[in-house]
UniProtKB/Swiss-Prot annotation:
SUPFAM superfamilies documented for this protein: L domain-like
Residues making up the signal peptide according to the UniProt record: 1-28
Inducers of expression: By ethylene.
Native source species: Arabidopsis thaliana
Residues listed as glycosylation sites in the UniProt record: 73, 79, 255, 269, 320, 346
Superkingdom of the source species: Eukaryota
Ranges of Pro residues composition bias in the record: 460-477, 487-542, 566-589, 694-713, 720-737, 752-769, 777-786
Task performed by this protein: Modulates cell morphogenesis by regulating cell wall formation and assembly, and/or growth polarization. Together with LRX2, component of the extracellular mechanism regulating root hair morphogenesis and elongation.
Protein name: Leucine-rich repeat extensin-like protein 2
InterPro entries named in the record: Leu-rich_rpt, LRR_dom_sf, LRR_extensin-like_regulator, LRR_N_plant-typ
This protein's UniProt keywords: Cell wall, Cell wall biogenesis/degradation, Developmental protein, Glycoprotein, Hydroxylation, Leucine-rich repeat, Repeat, Secreted, Signal
Length: 786
């Protein structure tokens, strides 16, 4: 009689203890930002080259225990003291001690791993590049990341991270590239983010709310993508302060209200301006005609009224003007002539007399079609009374989003399900993985292409032939290496190499999808089961014994970002997505591929010339590219990472660390190619400290001095053979919060021997492109541009 209740109580008590311990472990990670290796046992028989590699061993072994699923056995060779030979791990000479090798880069893109980030990763204090896009990592970003003082690029896109904005990234002094796309971050965007010297910010496809901070104009970024959130509120008038650096901005599908601030006319370097799928109203400011570099203008699916200003149609560089699904009543004769000027124009579903495909007379006489008084919105964007022709409509005044104290509904938008899982209906559904089905949703984005592609980096001046690193064997080249934004090095003091390498296209890996979506389709990669859904990013690099960097093939649908002088912002050119309400067009942003060798710039510092960016016009200090070589079936040693010599002459393929003090380089100019072509391997550059010719595809660690990074050339690195495997440390980090994956839930393939299956080979697996941005970062879902 008492047996049944007793059994039930025991089961309940056991489950309670299990979840309580997991929660306490997660909270412990959040509250404790200090790291201690006292509880981690290292086999005394293991011999390490230096204390830094011993610390890296502890960090990586702790991380290996925190990975619940590794379907491609990517961590099969994560054994022994030769951490530089681990799959996805890349070493380089330390900037402070050229004879000392340290772990300078991690590239696990497209590894499809499930797990969390243990706080021991903070022991990787020499890390400059950290690329994890297109996996199933969940939980929160550990506070111990604050110890990564040299971290230059952080790409966590297309995973299942949760919680509020990871404020720890605001404490990273060398950070230039931040990509948090396709996760489940929520709450407000901190205003301090726009006070940092960043070059690219990608926050699209999350759950951010409570408006865009008023100090947005303080940011020196060249690429800013906040699309597909639920921000609400007005576009800050401070946007006009970004005219010197901003090249591309995507604010589509953010529930924005109010009128378009006339200060946008100061954005003279912007090539892509996308504010589609919002609730913006009023007239289009004639100041748009001052945006001389504008190529893509998308204001579709809003509530704009009045007449199209003739100044817009006189822009000499305009290639695509989409103003459909508004309430415009007329357009200037010059705009009619655009149809014969090889300019794509879409003005359907408006109230323009004499045109086809317009709204009905009933819709055009509705309250939504009436002109409004922009000064009544309280956006503080207008300093003079509106033109007399515009009267305030009787519609209810739109107020900015509620304060952060209000709760955010977790069902607003469903993130893409893992490749094997189906997506449940939600208000905003992102494209499911190639194998998963997309459930109906209010806002559906096109599924990512079925094939995987690794990001490519735009070509920079050819670096001198990479010197061989005698101590270690050549690093394996990874097939799908994380894309890295290559920043143009300063003008070389010595003659450049005889011929430049093919241009590196900086593209983020797009999620796989059955076929390339139509042009400009903004789709998010599907997440994997368990943790928060994530979109797929570029596949992890396949390691081959060739030291040369792997080639990156952009996803068929999402456009890739080409980098010229500085990391290009993602261009979101998306083909039109199938969702009932067409999602905003995005310009696919591809994350920079990981460079196999990492180079550190010479100790001497010299300011590099300002980079010029074409295509996605993103002006900001270019991040150093890192090269990741493909991996062969057997775990090959990582590619060599080199730090540039202390002398002012350009060191061969050194890895540069960006200067500790943040000095923004001149705004880069990006060209955003609409067509997708396989980009060459992208190098990872660390900004050099000394004056020297910029090498092509080297990895730069920001120099300790405040001078801009110098160019570096890639060096062929031959990593030493990995020693016998030793048991990993017995310490096991607690799982992170918000992570549903467990060893029992996800398939975890344990390989008893190192000769386990090599990482899968991904061919052109694109992430959903972000329409309108051509920045090299983890591949976003591709969406056709309207």
């Amino acid at each position: 009689m008492l047996l049944f209740p007793s059994t039930s109580l025991r089961l309940f008590f056991f489950l309670f203890l299990l979840f309580s311990s997991c929660f306490l472990q997660i909270r412990g990670d959040d509250d404790d930002d200090d790291i201690s290796d006292d509880n981690i046992k290292v086999d005394p028989s293991l011999k390490f080259e230096n204390p830094s590699l011993r610390q890296a061993y502890i960090a990586l072994q702790s991380w290996k225990q925190a990975i619940f699923s590794d379907p491609f056995n990517f961590t099969a060779n994560w054994n022994g003291s030769d951490v530089c030979s681990y799959n996805g791990i890349f070493c380089a000479p330390s900037p402070s001690s050229p004879k000392t090798r340290v772990v300078a880069g991690i590239d696990l893109n497209h590894a499809d791993m499930a797990g969390y980030l243990p706080r021991e990763l903070g022991l990787l204090t020499d890390l400059a590049l950290f690329h994890l896009n297109s996996n199933r990592f969940c939980g929160e970003v550990p506070l111990t990341f604050k110890h990564m003082k040299l971290l230059f690029e952080l790409d966590l896109s297309n995973n299942r991270f949760v919680g509020k904005f990871p404020n720890v990234v605001l404490s990273l002094p060398s950070l230039k590239f931040l990509d948090l796309r396709y996760n489940e971050f929520e709450g407000s965007i901190p205003s301090k983010l726009f006070d940092k010297e960043l070059d690219a910010i990608f926050l699209n496809h999350n759950r951010f709310m409570f408006g865009i901070p008023e100090n947005m104009g303080n940011s020196p970024v060249s690429a800013l993508v906040l699309a597909d959130n639920d921000l609400g509120g007005c576009i800050p008038g401070s946007i006009g302060l970004m005219g010197k650096t901003l090249n591309e901005i995507i604010l589509s599908n953010d529930n924005l209200t109010g009128c378009l601030p006339p200060q946008i006319g100061n954005l003279k370097n912007v090539t892509v301006f996308d504010i589609s799928f919002n609730r913006l109203s009023g007239p289009l400011p004639s100041s748009i005609g001052n945006m001389k570099s504008l190529e893509q203008l998308n204001v579709a699916n809003n509530r704009f009224t009045g007449v199209i200003p003739s100044s817009i149609c006189q822009l000499s560089n305009l290639e695509n003007f989409t103003y459909s699904s508004n309430f415009f009543t007329g357009d200037a004769p010059r705009c009619v002539a655009l149809l014969g000027d090889n300019v794509v124009v879409n003005g359907s579903m408006n109230c323009i007399d004499g045109k086809e495909d317009q709204r009905s007379s009933k819709e055009c006489s509705s309250p939504a079609s009436r002109s409004v008084d922009c000064s009544k919105f309280g956006c503080n964007n207008f300093f003079s009374p509106p033109p007399p022709s515009f009267k305030m409509s009787p519609t209810v005044r739109v107020l900015p989003p509620p304060p952060p104290s209000s709760k955010m509904s977790p069902t607003f938008r469903a993130t893409p399900p893992p490749p094997s899982s189906k997506m449940s209906p939600s208000f905003r559904a992102t494209p499911p993985p190639p194998s998963s089905k997309m459930s109906p949703s209010f806002r559906a984005t096109p599924p990512p292409p079925s094939s995987k592609m690794s990001p490519s980096v735009k070509a920079y001046p050819p670096p001198p032939p990479p010197p061989e690193y005698e101590p270690s064997p050549p690093p394996p080249s990874s097939e799908m290496s994380p894309s890295v934004r290559a920043y143009p090095p300063p003008p070389p003091l010595s003659p450049p190499p005889p011929s430049p390498p093919p241009p590196y296209i900086y593209s983020s890996p797009p999620p796989p999808s059955p076929s390339p979506p139509p042009p400009y389709i903004y789709s998010s990669p599907p997440p994997v089961v368990n943790c928060p859904p994530t979109t797929q990013s570029p596949p992890p690099p396949k390691y081959e014994q060739t030291p040369s960097p792997r080639e990156y093939y952009p996803s068929p649908s999402p456009p890739y970002y080409q980098y010229t002088s500085s990391p290009p912002p993602p261009t979101y050119y998306a083909t039109q997505s199938p969702p009932p309400p067409p999602p905003p067009t995005y310009y696919a942003v591809q994350s920079p591929p990981p460079p196999p060798p990492v180079y550190y710039p010479p100790v001497t510092a010299s300011p590099p010339p300002p980079p010029v960016y074409y295509t996605p016009v993103i002006q900001s200090p270019p991040p150093p590219p890192v090269y990741y070589s493909p991996v062969t079936q057997s775990p090959p040693p990582p590619p060599p990472v080199y730090y540039p010599p202390v002398t002012q002459s350009p060191p061969p393929s050194p890895v540069y660390y960006p200067p500790v003090t943040q000095s923004p380089p001149p705004p880069p100019v990006y060209y955003l190619p609409v067509t997708q072509s396989p980009p060459p391997p992208s190098p990872v550059y660390y900004p050099p400290v000394a004056k020297s010719p910029p090498p092509p595809s080297p990895v730069y660690y920001p120099p300790v001095t405040q001078s801009p990074p110098p160019p570096s050339t890639p060096v062929e690195y031959h990593p030493p053979a990995s020693p016998n495997q030793s048991p990993p440390p017995e310490y096991q980090s607690p799982p992170p919060k918000g992570c549903n994956d467990s060893p029992s839930n996800d398939h975890h393939y344990q390989t008893p021997t190192p000769p386990s299956l090599p990482p899968p080979y991904y061919e052109d697996t694109p992430l959903p492109p972000i329409r309108g941005v051509s920045y090299a970062s983890p591949p976003p879902p591709s969406i056709p541009y309207y």
